[in-house]
């Protein structure tokens, strides 16, 4: 960028005024106005003044134009510590962590000392990269420079360790800080929520309220996420009420978490109400609502919302398209799914392995297994476990054991794989009556020292989660639960229910198969709900694995015989059973 050096000597009030205008343009995202100001700065030679250069870097950073920030930085002949801090922060804020850390190295090579503005940007970059090793180096640097006791630097370190999964280090840092602010508390809560340590996160939130800490939207979002992950609907509603009293319910950040809470707890109408009440919607809340509709089989609403999102001017990202593809897959809309897959290229978004896995799943569910295989064969990137796994699952559904074995071999060629792949192959063999091959697949799993994930179902009652495993009798109400199932079983048989014992994936005699399938975990959880909840309350059951075909059929009969709404969330989607019908239309 050419500079007019003869115009450098200008009255001081001129460059102060320019700085104020650049700051205003950054705050209001007035890109055109900012570009015009930059042109004036160049013509008048004001870019030689460090304060002006700093404001130019900040303007481009806030406008999400980090490479223009870099040009402004490079055009500045006098780079102060603040100039370096501005560019390092710019890269961190614009998701360019490696560049942020690279410029930190350059700054230190110039014998400039990083301060309490630079160090938080560096730790943020480490958190984005999940590079705890580099983060520890930044931590050491903060100790050498004496900034480790600074509340902002300390908070950023807590956040970094938490996001890198080093929850013990995060808590140690949190406990040793001489002073904490709301960012510190929120970072620690987020860390516990991310690691699934929900009780710790909730306890910390209560402690923050007890200390009269002015919690922020990040705090609310973290604790609402805990309630969502634990499916604690009633507690989540209470915290939602608290967020309204604190005026944080209109935040897109909190709104996204609330949408996820109501969706994961089986209340999609609550999710949509929250979505509608957030005045300014960011991409996160659009994606959260799309996912909620997709999980609840509201495919048409997904497509309508996607169109509405684009009309609003919001640009979709890879998560947006993944939600739309999953919705099409679950509804069997293959042609529509292919259309949206192709639209990704028009939006200049390269499909990831997750998008290809969704496309393979879509074709596989529809029985178009050869087309699914062709998609994998022609992928421009290497197929991952999730891609081959999608084909393997479809082969199990359509009892194509030869192709299932081929897909499994391809997965095993990738190296160590999840236990789910072995189980899927075993299930494919068992579904086809090849119990000897199924046993071999499970033996291979045992020989590798891996364990099959235990199927669990759980239900919330008065902020307490009751968990059940198939056939267990450890619950305090086991006697009543099994009596209820026996009574309900008789009513279901009178209504025409016949157990499909082909879903018992091991070779046992007919009577034992009949008994085994009647006591799957979701049935125990439903029976608990029937004897515990009032008649007008829907029974909401969560399950960590896919619901089996016979249980899916049985729950339809249960909804008829009990005249109850039963909502089951498995590891894939929601099923709402009412009057003998399921929201998935038996396509899952």
From Swiss-Prot:
Keyword Repeat carried by entry: yes
Keyword Repeat: yes
Region span, Type E(+) motif: 463-493
Pfam families recorded: DYW_deaminase, E_motif, PPR, PPR_2
GO BP term (any one): cytidine to uridine editing
Residues that span the membrane, as ranges: none
InterPro entries the UniProt entry points to: DYW_dom (IPR032867), E_motif (IPR046848), Pentatricopeptide_rpt (IPR002885), PPR_At4g14850-like_plant (IPR046960), TPR-like_helical_dom_sf (IPR011990)
Region (Type E motif): 387-462
Chain positions covered by the region annotation Type DYW motif: 494-588
Keywords: Repeat
GO MF terms held by the record: RNA binding; zinc ion binding
PPR repeat placement: 14-48, 49-79, 80-114, 115-149, 150-180, 181-215, 216-250, 251-281, 282-316, 317-351, 352-386
Alphabetized NCBIfam families for the sequence: PPR
Recorded family membership: Belongs to the PPR family. PCMP-H subfamily.
Protein name: Putative pentatricopeptide repeat-containing protein At5g52630
Gene: PCMP-H52
